[in-house]
Design a protein with these regions (language model features):
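Bacterial Sec-dependent N-terminal signal peptides
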Residues: 1-32
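Residues forming well-ordered secondary-structure scaffolds
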Residues: 18, 141-144, 185, 195
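Beta-propeller domains
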Residues: 29-110, 118-121, 131-145, 149-160
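Hydrophobic core register within WD40 beta-propeller blades
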Residues: 67, 114-116, 177-180
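Short coil/turn segments that connect the beta-strands within blades of beta-propeller domains
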Residues: 72-73, 123-126, 185-188
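Conserved beta-strand element within WD40/beta-propeller blades
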Residues: 77, 128-130, 190-192
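A broad, low-specificity signal marking well-ordered, structured residues that form hydrophobic/aromatic
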Residues: 114, 126, 144
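Aromatic- and glycine-enriched pocket-lining scaffold segments that form the walls
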Residues: 161-204
């Protein structure tokens, strides 16, 4: 999937994409495992869904999380936008995320500030899109960035591709991201909103 900037879009498109995303998310086992703040987890691999007790020390995320599983519902990895953890709840070797080079992420927060989509051209790879907040010289930056996670790395537990980590897409963004599949090419549209204007940015 090639990521490239497209033009700004209007608010009505966001509403449409949010509805489409809901339908897409319910269609595959890739979205059967959910994590949220302070160690809470639920799986939709069972009927009815099962709440899985998880120690807060394992998933002590306080803000937004994003999770991806295999097409059969096996957990692959998850993130809060600050670190990426594998299915064994270990931080991936290259999974600590930064803002500008060597500047730690302060936090990643918002209703949906981290989003994972599969690579349409490689079933072993996934794109993680994140809105990251970091402080540099007293100024707080809010950037949209992405990483590529390759599940063939780290003995099959997955890791961030070193040449595709924290790739910058846009600045001054709000803490919300959404996505929908482009039917003609099987790629994904990624949409976010400016933090200070009424503009939307879309990427394909």
């Amino acid at each position: 999937m090639k990521v490239q900037p497209i033009i700004m879009f209007r608010k009505i498109i966001l509403i449409f994409l949010l509805m489409v995303q809901g339908m897409f998310a319910s269609a595959q086992g890739q979205f059967n495992n959910w994590f949220w703040s302070l160690g809470q987890r639920i799986t939709f691999n069972t009927n009815p869904p099962t709440v899985i007790p998880t120690a807060a020390s394992i998933t002590s995320f306080a803000y937004t999380t994003a999770v991806i599983s295999s097409p059969t519902g096996v957990l692959l990895f998850y993130t809060d936008g600050k670190v990426i953890k594998d299915a064994a709840h270990n931080t991936m070797p290259n999974g600590t995320l930064n803002g500008a080079p060597n500047i730690p992420v302060t936090y990643s927060t918002g209703k949906q500030s981290a989003l994972i989509v599969p690579d349409p051209g490689n079933s072993n790879r996934y794109y993680l899109f994140i809105v990251i907040y970091y402080n540099s010289g007293g100024t707080v930056y809010k950037d949209l960035r992405y990483c590529i996670i390759d599940m063939t790395l780290n003995s099959g537990m997955g890791d961030v591709v070193s040449t595709s980590k924290n790739v910058f897409l846009a600045s001054d963004v709000d803490g919300q991201i959404t996505a929908t599949r482009q039917t003609a090419t099987n790629n994904f549209w990624i949409l976010t909103h400016s933090n200070t204007t009424n503009n939307f940015s879309a990427f394909l």
